[in-house]
Amino acid sequence: MRLERVLEEARAKGYPIEDNGLGNLWVVLPRERFKEEMAHYKAMGFNFLADIVGLDYLTYPDPRPERFAVVYELVSLPGWKDGDGSRFFVRVYVPEEDPRLPTVTDLWGSANFLEREVYDLFGIVFEGHPDLRKILTPEDLEGHPLRKDYPLGETPTLFREGRYIIPAEFRAALTGKDPGLTFYKGGSRKGYRSLWADLKKAREVKG
């Protein structure tokens, strides 16, 4: 299969291979060889670029070579141009001080909007893109919202069925350090902690 050839070539060239044990494999390409290798994968028969995602490792617990990375999902679609169903990911690290990569829109048309999304949300510039501009955020929004150091505004949000979430408490709950969900009850807010105390008290009374 094509995937076996990809892995054999990666090992021979000294490219790291990452395996999450769940059937997903990443080949880590050096930025200076990225476009050349992507063109090679296209010629090899990876006829579909399924996705492109940006990553910011600013607060990641394990050290990475660079703050940013871009991941590409390549597929050899069966039944189209002799595809055999092979699938793997390409990861390329991008330095914070020079966040640029060459575009792959000339190889896969599906890269057009995907690269624009990564550019908009992470600020990674894809050189040679035919129309590199914002795609999700307002034109007057400064910065890139998926960068870990982007200053997010916070507004308490009332959801359907009376659920009320306060951002700071919600974040606390996600860390596991403190209950975070609160509820909107008849014009007042009753925190999760208070509801839990009421439940414990009711259980004690019940015996």
UniProtKB/Swiss-Prot annotation:
UniProt keyword Acetylation, yes or no: no
EC top class named in words: translocase
UniProt entry tagged with the keyword Translocase: yes
GO molecular function, one term: NADH:ubiquinone reductase (non-electrogenic) activity
Pfam families per UniProt: Complex1_30kDa
Superkingdom of the organism of origin: Bacteria
Keywords: Cell membrane, Membrane, NAD, Quinone, Translocase, Transport
Subcellular location: Cell membrane
Signal peptide boundaries: none
InterPro entries: NADH_DH_suC, NADH_quin_OxRdtase_su_C/D-like, NADH_UbQ_OxRdtase_30kDa_su, NADH_UbQ_OxRdtase_CS
UniProt membrane topology term: Peripheral membrane protein
Reactions the enzyme catalyzes: a quinone + NADH + 5 H(+)(in) = a quinol + NAD(+) + 4 H(+)(out)
The enzyme's E.C. designation: 7.1.1.-
Gene Ontology annotations for the cellular component aspect, listed alphabetically: plasma membrane
Self-association state and partner proteins as the record states: NDH-1 is composed of 15 different subunits, Nqo1 to Nqo15. The complex has a L-shaped structure, with the hydrophobic arm (subunits Nqo7, Nqo8 and Nqo10 to Nqo14) embedded in the membrane and the hydrophilic peripheral arm (subunits Nqo1 to Nqo6, Nqo9 and Nqo15) protruding into the bacterial cytoplasm. The hydrophilic domain contains all the redox centers.
Function: NDH-1 shuttles electrons from NADH, via FMN and iron-sulfur (Fe-S) centers, to quinones in the respiratory chain. The immediate electron acceptor for the enzyme in this species is menaquinone. Couples the redox reaction to proton translocation (for every two electrons transferred, four hydrogen ions are translocated across the cytoplasmic membrane), and thus conserves the redox energy in a proton gradient required for the synthesis of ATP. The Nqo5 subunit may be involved in the stabilization of the complex.
Family assignment from sequence similarity: Belongs to the complex I 30 kDa subunit family.
Name of the featured protein: NADH-quinone oxidoreductase subunit 5
